């Protein structure tokens, strides 16, 4: 038994080391991708974040907030891969596969663990101005702890770059493009994101209103549902409020959350979040097809138990909030 446990532990250590080495090799192959922060030297100040290992939406908030704050403070963004196996495993599963250009913006280091020495957005606040908190901080290295960094304000200064980074993996882009036929690619696409918490009856009323508006403006409208629950999709597609509009219908049920985000970046002209605090849905809206793509979300007060961020910090001001009283 002792030998078997030791062999299992050895195998896991070898696996983790292999992942770290692979990340370092891949990132080293793309030195031109990290010119945003200049060449790193030991004299430059660095910043590390205590990163989320949750779903892809949480990971994006954490990583991109790290990058945005680093740029604001003129510090090098560092991810320490040593003694951080859970984070490395998480990044390897989705970020490394689908969004490698985002990881290429970081310096991936193997160094002794760094203790948390700063906090940002902790006390019931999604956003705190990093300049106000850290601009006079002369420490060579900051290790920042937060509450998930769920605010676009941390990284909105990088939005144009982020929109490019999510499209830089050619294989992922091709996979997303091929989810629909060539004849459907020029349709005007309304993308609806749903979760287990989505209210079917409220959602169908809102979708009907959205369809009523856009089918009067565009001839070829396509309704796309991004939900892992076939019951929700079936309810929407077969409902009489929806069927009266002439639209093509498509489900992304077989696509991973990260693939749905890439699909939204390529195709979604309109995004509707039926559960406003879903970080996966949020990124579908933030990275929709165009800078001026319309994003709608239900009033967060409909979901008091799901509140994870301040509304003013979480939702960009251009997004449109839909009332619970929608008819």
From Swiss-Prot:
GO biological process, alphabetically ordered: innate immune response; macromolecule glycosylation
Domain of life according to the entry: Eukaryota
Bilayer topology term: Single-pass membrane protein
Subcellular location(s) of the protein: Membrane
Keywords tagged on the record: Membrane, Transmembrane, Transmembrane helix
Membrane-crossing residue ranges in chain numbering: 13-33
GO CC aspect terms: membrane
This protein's name: Uncharacterized protein T25D10.1
């Amino acid at each position: 038994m002792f030998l078997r446990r030791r062999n299992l532990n050895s195998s896991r250590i070898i696996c983790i080391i292999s992942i770290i080495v692979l990340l370092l090799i891949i990132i080293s192959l793309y030195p031109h991708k990290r010119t945003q922060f200049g060449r790193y030297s030991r004299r430059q100040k660095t910043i590390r974040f205590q990163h989320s290992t949750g779903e892809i939406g949480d990971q994006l908030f954490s990583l991109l907030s790290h990058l945005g704050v680093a740029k604001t403070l003129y510090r090098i963004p560092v991810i320490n891969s040593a003694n951080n196996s859970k984070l490395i495993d998480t990044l390897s599963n989705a970020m490394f596969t689908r969004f490698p250009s985002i990881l290429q913006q970081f310096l991936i280091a193997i160094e002794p663990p760094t203790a948390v020495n700063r906090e940002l957005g902790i006390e019931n606040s999604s956003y705190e101005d990093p300049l106000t908190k850290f601009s006079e901080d002369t420490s060579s290295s900051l290790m920042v702890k937060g509450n998930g960094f769920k605010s676009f304000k941390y990284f909105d200064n990088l939005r144009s770059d982020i929109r490019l980074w999510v499209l830089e993996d050619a294989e992922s882009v091709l996979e997303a493009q091929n989810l629909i036929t060539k004849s459907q690619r020029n349709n005007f696409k309304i993308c609806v994101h749903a979760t287990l918490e989505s209210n079917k009856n409220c959602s169908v009323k809102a979708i009907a209103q959205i369809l009523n508006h856009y089918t009067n403006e565009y001839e070829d409208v396509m309704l796309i549902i991004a939900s892992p629950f076939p019951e929700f999709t079936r309810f929407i597609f077969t409902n009489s409020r929806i069927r009266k509009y002439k639209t093509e219908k498509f489900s992304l049920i077989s696509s991973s959350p990260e693939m749905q985000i890439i699909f939204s970046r390529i195709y979604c002209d309109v995004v509707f979040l039926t559960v406003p605090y879903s970080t996966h849905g949020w990124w579908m809206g933030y990275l929709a097809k165009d800078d001026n793509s319309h994003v709608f979300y239900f009033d967060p007060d409909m979901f008091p138990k799901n509140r994870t961020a301040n509304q003013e910090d979480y939702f960009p001001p251009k997004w449109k909030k839909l009332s619970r009283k929608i008819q």
